[in-house]
Curated annotation (Swiss-Prot):
Disulfide bonds: none annotated. GO terms for biological process: carbohydrate metabolic process. Pfam families: Gal_mutarotas_2, Glyco_hydro_31_2nd, Glyco_hydro_31_3rd. It comes from Saccharolobus solfataricus (strain 98/2). GO terms for cellular component: cytoplasm. This is Alpha-glucosidase.
Length: 700
């Protein structure tokens, strides 16, 4: 039996079994030996050969959430999950694993949340009440391991401590939350500019354009195709003149070519096999080698390549295929799952590194299977350093794969989804699962990535519009499509559908200051931007079954329509809720019918900053805006921590508001625009406060 040590710091318990060599070191500051035993932590540990098995009891009314990107219900009970990054193209509901492995789950028992994070990048298996009805069983294929027990009592408390341990999310620039367009692939460069011009002429605000692999010369990284993109600097300048950013895809495969500079400069920094020879595989450029990102010197070299690439004016980097994938070895998913006694039907082929690949981590040689899931984390880390090396204040990295800590460096999107009504619902489950696993900056391919190669594909315009609507408040907002897929850019739709998408995109921009305020909150505290309802109402068991609505921060509930219908029933949690579209105030813990295509409800006690220096205030609360201005509302007063400009103030109140007084001097009349809604046009800087007359903000 290996030795077991337990350390503790501020409600985080580190359990060390044997002498583990973790894939990444997450130091527990001021760690002290804990007096708590495993039994007091509610755990049992069994060692079977080269495996460690950790068990905890599972109560009937207990909820298990987290585990990252899983194509299942958000309450993870009665299923077994595998942590093993794969290229999961055209995935479906109930297929596992996918691209991202976050070995963190949160138990909510009797209203109290506790987190369990296993710092292993190997094929960890979580059995949540499947093999044993009353147990959670975690199997780690190593004889030594470290894991953490994180006390709540709120889900939010667990995520704050988890991100304190694994790293707070980076703060992207505001443009990164705008509307992006992408395709596999846009070219030549004149057509890229022409498309942007068409979009802007039709009134679509495009924040960024993504270039897929066809911009490269023979798919070689850090090159431009000589005919498709003969003047890349001109392209970048033309886009920047239009206030549009350029993001280029960068895979992890370096072409074997004696005349190719990155191959020559990278010698000694690529992955090897056990014999010490280079691991030579296949990827888009053909015969390929792969950077060993676990090596510090490799990360330094890669950061230099990224920095040089960015020096042209490229604004962002899109990391793809980084599970990591290699085309020379395709295995059946059942081989990945071979150790599991129960398997769901899944006939996928996945492309992975061979078993004999090795890496060098902190000077030690380790097998690929022991650290596989952390490969994209180290790639993102090196890419992030490339931005720092180039002295960029604005950092944008998008990654398909990830491991615990990826939030420090990158956005995550849910990969190559398939346009269908089932997928529409699944995307919300996936992004919410990532959000409550410490990855706040998430999104999906709007419109579904796959082209016309699958029978279940639905290319209807109604579904495309619903994708745009579903993702209205997703932190990452990008349409993307395969080479043989329809055009998902809305300018190519008939006017009726084009205008629908335009309304959705404009509404997103209207709420962008609120979304970006939540991004600041995420970077400071580790809170998710979008959340399942149970995140805010964790002691209400009913909320754990609501998976087609989501909270945007604490204050906004959005209920996208994820069916062919044009209306839907909306579950409102306890409290009072303001219908954004008609001003109705509704008592919560109720189910209401919404006939609006974009059902939005504001929670009592909310402050919502909007585009154009507008504010919505509903009840008593406080809020930190993206520019660090603190706004506080009391019964008859709104205070500002510093001088800010306000163009329009919307006050939600069940009692009439007749006028406001700005900074004890200027009196402004208030107009009632719809029920419970009072609007004051201010158009000036406010030094300190606004007083309300004729009503109070506090609801009776």
């Amino acid at each position: 039996m290996q030795t077991i040590k337990i350390y503790e710091n501020k409600g985080v318990y580190k359990v060390v079994i044997g002498e583990p060599f973790p894939p990444i070191e997450f130091p527990l500051e001021q760690k002290i030996s804990s007096n708590k035993s495993l039994s007091e932590l509610g755990l049992t540990i069994v060692q079977q050969g080269n495996k460690v098995i950790v068990e905890k009891s599972l109560d009937l009314k207990e909820h298990i959430i987290g585990l990252g990107e899983k194509a299942f219900e958000l309450d993870r009970k009665r299923k077994r999950y595998v942590m093993y990054n794969v290229d999961a193209g055209a995935y479906k509901k109930y297929q596992d694993p996918l691209y991202v492995s976050i070995p963190l789950f949160i138990s909510v028992k009797d209203g109290v949340a506790t987190g369990y994070f296993f710092n292993s990048a190997s094929k960890v298996i979580f059995d949540v009440g499947l093999e044993e009805y009353d147990k959670v069983i975690v199997t780690i294929p190593e004889d030594s391991v470290e894991f953490y027990v994180i006390e709540g009592p709120r889900i939010e408390d667990v995520l704050e401590k988890y991100t304190e341990l694994t790293g707070k999310p980076f703060l992207p620039p505001m443009w990164a939350f705008g509307y992006m367009i992408s395709r596999y692939s846009y070219y030549p460069q004149d057509k890229v500019v022409e498309l942007v011009d068409i979009m802007q002429k039709e009134g679509f605000r495009v924040a960024g354009v993504f270039l897929d692999i066809h911009y490269m010369d023979s798919y070689k990284l850090f090159t431009w195709h000589p005919y498709r993109f003969p003047e890349p600097k001109k392209l970048i300048d033309e886009l920047h003149k239009r206030n549009v950013k350029l993001i280029t895809i960068v895979d992890h495969g370096i072409r074997v070519d004696q005349n190719y500079s990155p191959f020559l400069s990278g010698m000694g920094k690529f992955c090897e096999i056990e014999s010490g020879e280079l691991f030579v595989g296949k990827m888009w450029p053909g015969t390929t080698v792969y950077p060993d990102f676990f090596r510090e010197d490799t990360r330094e070299w890669w950061a230099g390549l990224i920095s040089e690439w960015l020096s042209q004016g490229v604004d962002g980097i899109w990391l793809d295929m980084n599970e990591p994938t290699d085309f020379s070895r395709a295995i059946e998913i059942r081989d990945v799952l071979s150790s599991l006694p129960v398997q769901f039907r899944d006939d996928r082929l996945v492309t992975t590194f061979p078993d004999n690949v090795v890496h060098y981590l902190r000077g030690k040689r380790v097998k690929h299977e022991k650290v596989r899931n952390a490969y994209p984390l180290y790639e993102a880390m090196a890419t992030f350093k490339g931005f720092r090396t180039s002295h960029r204040n604005e950092i944008f990295i998008l990654s398909r794969a990830g491991y615990a800590g990826i939030q420090r460096y990158a956005f995550i999107w849910t990969g190559d989804n398939t346009p269908s009504w089932d997928d529409l619902k699944l995307q919300l489950q996936l992004v919410l699962g990532l959000s409550i696993s410490g990855v706040p900056f998430v999104g999906c391919d709007i419109g579904g990535f796959q082209g016309r190669n699958f029978a279940e594909i639905d290319n209807s315009m109604d579904l495309l519009v619903k994708y745009y609507a579903l993702a209205l408040f997703f932190p990452f907002y990008r349409s993307h499509k395969a080479t043989d897929g329809i055009d998902t850019e809305p300018v190519f739709l008939p006017d009726y559908y084009k205008e629908k998408v335009k309304e959705i995109v404009e509404l997103r921009y209207k709420f962008l200051p609120y979304i970006y305020s939540l991004a600041l909150e995420a970077s400071e505290k580790g809170h998710p931007v979008i959340r399942p309802l149970f995140y805010e109402f964790q002691d209400d068991d009913d909320m754990y079954r609501i998976e087609d609505e989501y909270m945007v921060g604490k204050y906004l509930l959005y209920a996208p329509i994820v069916s062919k219908e044009e209306s839907r029933l909306v579950t409102l949690p306890r409290g009072k809720w303001y219908n954004y579209w008609n001003g109705e105030i509704i008592n919560g813990k109720s189910v209401v019918k919404s006939t609006h295509e974009l059902p939005i409800y504001l929670r009592e006690g909310s402050i919502i900053p909007l585009e154009g220096d507008e504010l919505i205030v509903y009840g008593e609360t406080s809020f930190k805006r993206y520019d660090n201005a603190e706004i506080t509302s009391s019964s008859n007063e709104i205070k500002f921590s510093r001088e800010i400009y306000v163009s329009k103030l919307t006050i939600t109140s069940e009692k009439p508001v007749s006028k406001i007084i700005v900074d004890d001097s200027k009196e402004i009349q208030v107009e009632k625009t719809m029920q419970n809604t009072y609007v004051a046009k201010i158009n000036q800087k406010i030094r300190g406060k606004i007083n309300l007359e004729g009503s109070v903000l506090k609801q009776s």
